[in-house]
Swiss-Prot record:
<comment type="similarity">
    <text>Belongs to the profilin family.</text>
</comment>
<dbReference type="GO" id="GO:0003779">
    <property type="term" value="F:actin binding"/>
</dbReference>
<dbReference type="GO" id="GO:0120316">
    <property type="term" value="P:sperm flagellum assembly"/>
</dbReference>
<dbReference type="GO" id="GO:0030317">
    <property type="term" value="P:flagellated sperm motility"/>
</dbReference>
<keyword id="KW-0963">Cytoplasm</keyword>
<comment type="function">
    <text>Involved in male fertility. Required for manchette development and acrosome biogenesis during spermiogenesis. Binds in vitro to phospholipids, including phosphatidylinositol 3-phosphate (PtdIns(3)P), phosphatidylinositol 4,5-bisphosphate (PtdIns(4,5)P2), phosphatidylinositol 4-phosphate (PtdIns(4)P) and phosphatidic acid (PA). Contrary to other profilin family members, does not bind to actin in vitro.</text>
</comment>
<dbReference type="GO" id="GO:0008289">
    <property type="term" value="F:lipid binding"/>
</dbReference>
<keyword id="KW-0221">Differentiation</keyword>
<keyword id="KW-0446">Lipid-binding</keyword>
<dbReference type="GO" id="GO:0007283">
    <property type="term" value="P:spermatogenesis"/>
</dbReference>
<dbReference type="InterPro" id="IPR048278">
    <property type="entry name" value="PFN"/>
</dbReference>
<dbReference type="Pfam" id="PF00235">
    <property type="entry name" value="Profilin"/>
</dbReference>
<keyword id="KW-0217">Developmental protein</keyword>
<dbReference type="GO" id="GO:0005737">
    <property type="term" value="C:cytoplasm"/>
</dbReference>
<dbReference type="InterPro" id="IPR036140">
    <property type="entry name" value="PFN_sf"/>
</dbReference>
<dbReference type="InterPro" id="IPR005455">
    <property type="entry name" value="PFN_euk"/>
</dbReference>
<dbReference type="GO" id="GO:1905198">
    <property type="term" value="P:manchette assembly"/>
</dbReference>
């Protein structure tokens, strides 16, 4: 298992409030690592990248279509996207080299998912990633 995959498992899934997670390489626009059983299609990668490329107001208004579900965007800025669909959600944090993607499901606390994902993003930014 790679260092990055261990980082995802320990810092995100270890909280028990992140269902699945992935790192997407910004430059290559490809998946780098994922948690076991989590597949992110190329169309989903494009959706997340476009969420940051658009004006944040437009992203908030339009929402996100991720993993075959429509999500209402509750936060969109230069570094973070938060979106929800009923009792599930996706949190995306942008660093210099990666998008950190985390999902949560029913029974999990979205606030814990957000905090863990933002902290991992901050750690990667400090490391120059």
């Amino acid at each position: 298992m790679s260092h990055l995959q261990n980082l995802l498992l320990d810092t995100l899934l270890g909280t028990k409030h992140v269902d699945s997670a992935a790192l997407i390489k910004l430059q290559e626009k490809t998946l780098c690592v994922t948690s076991p059983g989590f597949s992110v299609m190329p169309s989903d990668v494009r959706t997340l990248l476009n969420g940051f490329a658009k004006n944040p107001l437009l992203t908030r208004r339009e929402g996100l279509y991720f993993k075959e579900k429509d999500y209402k965007c509750v936060r969109a800025d230069d570094y973070s996207l938060y979106a929800k669909n009923e009792n599930t959600g996706v949190v995306v944090v942008k660093t210099n080299m990666y998008l950190v993607v985390a999902t949560y499901t029913a029974g999990m606390y979205p606030s814990v998912c957000v905090e863990a994902t933002e902290k991992l993003g901050e750690y990667l930014r400090k490391k120059g990633n």
